[in-house]
Amino acid sequence: MLSSQTSSIFTVSRLNQTVRLLLEQEMGQVWISGEISNFTQPASGHWYFTLKDDTAQVRCAMFRNSNRRVTFRPQHGQQVLVRANITLYEPRGDYQIIVESMQPAGEGLLQQKYEQLKAKLQAEGLFDQQYKHPLPSPAYCVGVITSKTGAALHDILHVLKRRDPSLPVIIYPAAVQGEDAPGQIVRAITLANARKECDVLIVGRGGGSLEDLWSFNDERVARAIFASTIPVVSAVGHETDVTIADFVADLRAPTPSAAAEVVSRNQQELLRQMQTACQRLEMAMDYYLANRQRRFSQLYHRLQQQHPQLRLARQQTTLERLRQRMHLALENQLKQANQRQQRASQRLRQQNPQPRIHRAQSRIQQLEYRLAENFRARLSEQRERFGNTVTHLEAVSPLATLARGYSVSTATDGNVLKKVKQLKVGDMMTTRLKDGWVTSEVTAIKPVKKIRLG
């Protein structure tokens, strides 16, 4: 029974390999949605995390060459959509998925696109305060770009009628939700700028979800608002809703009604302000006239008390006194300047630089002579040391030994021959003499018997 089943017995390694091949070949690439947990990024740059839902979880790996294409930083608890290959890690038998691409799931993807476009336009300078147009004060004609059936238009018209019934309003209807909405909003802004009928534009709609307000996060709408020569007030959703259009517009209003408040004048308030201003002007004129009358009386009284001839005499005395003081001051300054000049001339005569120059020249000549003497002494010393070194090297040179009749023999492998047992009959050897080399063949070997002393 056991021998009949031997062909079906798997080793652990073979089993894991077979399962891995089945998973990779049968499943291929799949799309998986889930929540990220246990996210880590070691020094290798790879991502390791768990993808889970309410009832299950699976280990995931995303290698560096794949995760570098991801445009956001995965966070714990974030819902994502991944494209991955299913495999099995053979050494441990762990089932896992290898992620090739990742993107936020659902509204998270819209938020990611929102942040990317916001960063792009901000880098281009579309949000800079220097490009904002001031709103006209007062506005003589208001343009409204919104849906003609929406509640936002009703709120805007209601506020404008209450605050300034005489203010002209031109409506440029446009869809504010759906695929066609961005194009219609752009065309309405372009049309308003071409007609030049109004001096301020309100662009907006009522509240809604991120998807509902997405038309105002469209890049085309943002660039159209930025290019508008007519000041634009954005009024999208509620106060907590912030769109790309709000950053590009010249002014952001929290609601459509607030936008209408910003661009209009309150006629009742203007009338009250005019009445108050008239009263303040009358009081100011009365005070000014009374003050001028009092000042005139004071000046007239002083003029009667101070005769012009008396004032001229006092001024003449003061002028003469000032003239004398100025004359004395000039004389003192000239005297002091002359004294300073004399002292400077005396110091200059005492500090003649010529003797110092002569002393410096003598010092230089002495130093040059000492330098030359030191150089000659050092040169003689070095020559003597060099001669001694040459004599010493010649005394210990092996060539001198060879000159006295000695020789050095080497085998064919280059080793120096010191004993006869390094050779055998028929070997070749090379002998170094004083004036050259001799190559010879060994024909006989005769060892020398050692002489024992004692």
Curated annotation (Swiss-Prot):
An annotated GO BP: DNA catabolic process
Localization per record: Cytoplasm
Region (Disordered): 337-359
Biased composition range(s): Low complexity: 337-352
Enzyme class: hydrolase
GO molecular function: exodeoxyribonuclease VII activity; nucleic acid binding
Enzyme Commission number(s): 3.1.11.6
Superkingdom, taxonomy of origin: Bacteria
Listed GO CC annotations: cytoplasm; exodeoxyribonuclease VII complex
Cysteine disulfide links: none
Catalytic activity: Exonucleolytic cleavage in either 5'- to 3'- or 3'- to 5'-direction to yield nucleoside 5'-phosphates
InterPro entries in alphabetical order: Exonuc_VII_L, Exonuc_VII_lsu_C, OB-fold_nuc-bd_dom
Self-association and partners: Heterooligomer composed of large and small subunits.
Role noted for this protein: Bidirectionally degrades single-stranded DNA into large acid-insoluble oligonucleotides, which are then degraded further into small acid-soluble oligonucleotides.
Protein name: Exodeoxyribonuclease 7 large subunit
Source species of the chain: Salmonella arizonae (strain ATCC BAA-731 / CDC346-86 / RSK2980)
Organism lineage string: Bacteria, Pseudomonadati, Pseudomonadota, Gammaproteobacteria, Enterobacterales
Gene: xseA
